[in-house]
């Protein structure tokens, strides 16, 4: 009798999470192996937003290549422009005027707040808190207005340029940003009241996706992901660029390495960015002068000068048709973007186009740990883990 009973073999259930899923944060496709509702294995499939950015850049001049960086992590555009501009400046051997550097710091920190506002509020939405996302988008709108006033675009700014920034800030903008920084701490406090001690939010995030200090280093984490695990690593302090060493700010560090710790790190980073913005505005008020290098072979002449000088008109025409030639060489330049270390490995062969531009996206290193972080958690917890990673597929797929 016993011999006739077929042995039952229990196999894990395979399911697709995304790419059309509200919590996938873009076009993430996860192939999950489930034991009931517990994740045994998570296999992220990337490439659905691949546009060949690195190859396209090889066919563009250095000026034409810069706008591609806005379209990578499209919720924090100016940070990536910053990395490419610094890399090109390093190869050219030029130094940006002090006022231009302060404007870059100012808008890098506005970008950090823009990014964290979106991440924290949509992270709340992922785990069931709807109100923060409605508040967050309203607040981001005010910051996007600053983007628009300085560059003409709300998202794809194309404002940072090798040699400085495109134009100086328009009259009245500094006062409006200062006024915003006075109101912003109240908004952060309100957001803090909604989420930080919220019982349901803590149940969904505490002890979920725990990454130890050693594991965070081994997986190549950076930004809030590594700081949430207790490693005080921030390129603005460790390898200062564009006068960050003149600014006074703290690096928030978590202790538990879970989703909740990463949330707290981002909350405090918004407060620190507000401090940095105020310091940058104070320094700008005392620092008149040019915002880009006075080299007509690299930076285009002012419009008024082009109407008076034939030489300026020729420079402008040559810059926007042929571009400038960058001396042969290579450099790896990284900035502390809102998501972590965003790096550009730029190789020049002495022509007017990059020979190779390798982009080190921040989210790629974080997403590769998805299997490690979600193993043994419930299906609903993978949503919280993805939200705490702050991934955007524009930069991961490139």
Swiss-Prot record:
E.C. number: 7.1.1.-
List the catalysed reactions.
a quinone + NADH + 5 H(+)(in) = a quinol + NAD(+) + 4 H(+)(out)
- Does the keyword section mention Lyase? no
Q: Name one GO molecular function term.
A: NAD binding
Name the source's superkingdom.
Bacteria
One Pfam match, given by its short name, reads: Complex1_49kDa
- Keywords noted in UniProt: Cell inner membrane, Cell membrane, Membrane, NAD, Quinone, Translocase, Transport, Ubiquinone
Q: Where in the cell is it found?
A: Cell inner membrane
**Entry-linked InterPro entries:** NADH_Q_OxRdtase_suD, NADH_UbQ_OxRdtase_49kDa_CS, NDH1_su_D/H, NiFe-Hase_large
For the keyword Protein transport, the answer is no
A GO CC term?
A: plasma membrane
Give the matching PROSITE patterns: COMPLEX1_49K (PS00535)
Topology of the protein relative to the lipid bilayer: Peripheral membrane protein
- Tell me the function of this protein: NDH-1 shuttles electrons from NADH, via FMN and iron-sulfur (Fe-S) centers, to quinones in the respiratory chain. The immediate electron acceptor for the enzyme in this species is believed to be ubiquinone. Couples the redox reaction to proton translocation (for every two electrons transferred, four hydrogen ions are translocated across the cytoplasmic membrane), and thus conserves the redox energy in a proton gradient.
Describe the protein's quaternary organization and the partners it interacts with: NDH-1 is composed of 14 different subunits. Subunits NuoB, C, D, E, F, and G constitute the peripheral sector of the complex.
PANTHER family from the xrefs?
Answer: NADH DEHYDROGENASE [UBIQUINONE] IRON-SULFUR PROTEIN 2, MITOCHONDRIAL, NADH-UBIQUINONE OXIDOREDUCTASE 49 KDA SUBUNIT
Identify its protein family.
Answer: Belongs to the complex I 49 kDa subunit family.
Q: What's the protein here called?
A: NADH-quinone oxidoreductase subunit D
């Amino acid at each position: 009798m016993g011999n006739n009973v077929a042995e039952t073999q229990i196999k894990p259930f395979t399911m697709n999470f995304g790419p059309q899923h509200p919590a996938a944060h873009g076009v993430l496709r996860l192939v999950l192996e489930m034991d009931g509702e517990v994740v045994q294995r998570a296999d992220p499939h990337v490439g659905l937003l691949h546009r060949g950015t690195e190859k396209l850049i090889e066919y563009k001049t250095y000026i034409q290549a810069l706008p591609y960086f806005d379209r990578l992590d499209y919720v924090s555009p100016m940070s990536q422009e910053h990395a490419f501009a610094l890399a090109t400046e390093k190869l050219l051997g030029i130094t940006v005027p002090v006022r231009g550097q302060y404007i870059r710091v100012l808008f890098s920190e506005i970008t950090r707040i823009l990014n964290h506002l979106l991440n924290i509020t949509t992270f709340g939405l992922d785990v069931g808190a709807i109100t923060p996302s409605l508040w967050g988008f309203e607040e981001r709108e005010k910051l996007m207005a600053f983007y628009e006033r300085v560059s003409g675009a709300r998202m794809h700014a194309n404002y940072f340029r090798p040699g400085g920034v495109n134009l100086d800030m328009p009259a009245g903008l500094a006062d409006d940003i200062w006024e915003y920084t006075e109101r912003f701490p109240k908004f952060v406090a309100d957001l803090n009241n909604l989420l930080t001690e919220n019982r349901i939010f803590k149940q969904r995030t505490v002890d979920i996706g725990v990454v130890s200090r050693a594991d965070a280093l081994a997986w190549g984490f950076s930004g809030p992901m590594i700081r949430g695990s207790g490693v005080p690593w921030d390129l603005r302090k460790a390898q200062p660029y564009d006068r960050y060493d003149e600014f006074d700010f703290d690096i928030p560090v978590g202790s538990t390495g879970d989703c909740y710790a990463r949330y707290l790190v981002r909350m405090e980073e918004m407060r620190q960015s507000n401090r940095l913005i105020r310091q940058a505005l104070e320094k700008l008020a005392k620092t008149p002068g040019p915002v880009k290098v006075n080299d007509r072979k690299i930076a285009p002449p002012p419009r008024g000068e082009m109407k008076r000088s034939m030489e300026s008109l020729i420079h402008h025409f040559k810059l926007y048709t042929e571009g400038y030639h960058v001396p042969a060489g290579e450099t790896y330049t990284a900035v502390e973007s809102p998501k972590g270390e965003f790096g550009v490995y730029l190789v020049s062969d002495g022509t007017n186009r990059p020979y190779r531009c390798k982009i080190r996206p921040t989210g790629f290193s974080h997403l590769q740990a998805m299997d490690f972080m979600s193993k043994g958690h419930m299906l609903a917890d993978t949503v919280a883990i993805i939200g705490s990673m702050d991934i955007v597929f524009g930069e991961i797929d490139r």
